[in-house]
Amino acid sequence: MQLNGSQIFVEVLCEQGVDTLFGYPGGAVLNLYDELYKNADRITHVLTAHEQGAAHAADGYARATGRTGVVLATSGPGATNLVTGIATAYMDSVPMVAFTGNVPTSSIGKDGFQEAYIEGITVPITKHNFTVRRVEDLADTMRAAFRIAQSGRKGPVLVDIPKDVTAAVCEFTPKQPEPIRTVTTYNEEQVHWAADLINAAQRPLVYFGGGVRSAASCQPLRDLLHKAEIPATHTLMAAGVVPYGDPMNIGMVGMHGCYTSNRAVADCDVLIAVGTRYSDRVALKPKTFAKNATIIQIDIDASELGKNVDVDLSIVGDAAYVLNAMLPQIKPAKHPDWMTMIQSWQAQDYHPVSDPTRLMPHQVIGEVCNQCGPDAVYVTDVGQHQMWAAQYLRHTKSRGFITSGGLGTMGFGYGAAIGAQMALGRQQRVVMFTGDASFHMNLNEACTAVSYELPIITVIFNNSVLGMVRQWQTSFYGKRYSQTDPHRKTDFVKLADGFGLKGYRCTNLPEFQQAFAEALQRKGPTWIECIIDKDEKVLPMIPGGGDINDIIME
């Protein structure tokens, strides 16, 4: 059948199972938006306040579901406003397809109105990108973009579509989506060797990251831990893969991980790293990381093997397939001496002391868990509040904690929460933690939450400073607070009212308990501002370039 480019665009989106699209219209994509208008019963378009918010929303949608998030923006500044969101998804291996409009093909390279070379700009932050110069290529290019985003190590793909391509006509043939290409192969000899090392270990430790969540390999990982009594530590991106309360889960590792996890890495004799890249927030001193251990690394991306830390055995493969192949070769085991040692370290973990005269982050987060129960989805911005949430939330769901890990994008949270809420439905409880500085970045997305009546509860830790940077200045820069005390006078309660939502301000725990209970009953979005001390710190902390011997506990 004969269709124009805009009709093909919608047909392929539907063919790929896209039900929700985040974006912002403009001149170069008006043809696409006209077709979306005609197909509003097939695809829900979510209009955000800013293209960056749309990109983060597509990201949040993908993280909450595992499906590909889709974002659409116009040419020039519309496209460049997506860049931070695309880079955020790239660093955390999130499947996303970003569509951008462009000037007509005859005008490309002539510095026309709202022209930007978005294909070149995004080369370092996408798995692949395309510029479609013929309408005949549009359908297959879109299909390739979705396939690439979900295949192997997941990530974002950009498709740039000049305006004349959206109006041109060609023959279109519908196709069924191709199965996602999964890496099912692995080296059986290496898997056997890994099993032998694990079976012989006296102090084994599993260290897992977000790649386990992406590989849908949570259950075989848990089976391994319990079959051989192996304690496990995780990165920020893997919170919830092994639930809170599981005796094998000893907590987060790294710069703001717990004492036990960091001590266990230093003292284990076999370290099994699964779906993690040894980032500099975990392997702070790469040359001595797990220095007493034989290190096994399992990853779907061969380029990550041994990239940051020298390993003894590298296995390329999807974690689910590798772990399932390894499990029958693992002997049931107990490690009583090792577990006793772990328990002795747990007695030394940092536990904040509550102060009844003020509101403290761990109290707030604990109360949120008490009132929400185990099924909530938590989203964060970036800063101290992100680390407090990682440390004190009772993570029970593999996709229940959404945060920007690799890029550390301040302003990520509200857009991501909108995407998660749209993906999971209004009946799903979504709570977003932010700080006053991070929230200032993209709080304009409040209008989106209001427009779509999304019951997102936003908890704002307000210490009136740039908390994480200021903490570093306190510890390492002689308390020289350069540009971290902004002296802002933002009234978040009045601002909430201006956006058309309910806002609260709390200075003690009873006030927060009441405000949060009321927020749970509301149908639309709510902000709860929590006034905390500007000297509140994220502890423990291992300085960059340090190790367990440098840990700061007070």
Label the model's feature ranges.
Residues 24-26, 45-56, 71-78, 133-134, ...:
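Active-site nucleophile and cofactor-binding loops and adjacent substrate-binding regions
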Residues 136, 174, 292-384, 509-514, ...:
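Phosphate/pyrophosphate-binding active-site segments
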Residues 99, 107-109, 113-114, 306-308, ...:
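Thiamine diphosphate
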Residues 1-331, 367, 371-374, 429, ...:
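N-terminal alpha/beta PP-like core and its mobile active-site loop of ThDP/TPP-dependent enzymes
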Residues 61, 80, 337-354, 420, ...:
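Charged, low-complexity, helix-prone segments enriched in Lys/Glu/Asp/Gln
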Residues 9-10, 14-19, 27, 32-37, ...:
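Active-site diphosphate/adenylate-binding microenvironment
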Residues 69-71, 159, 378, 401, ...:
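Well-ordered beta-strand positions enriched in small/hydrophobic/aromatic, beta-favoring residues
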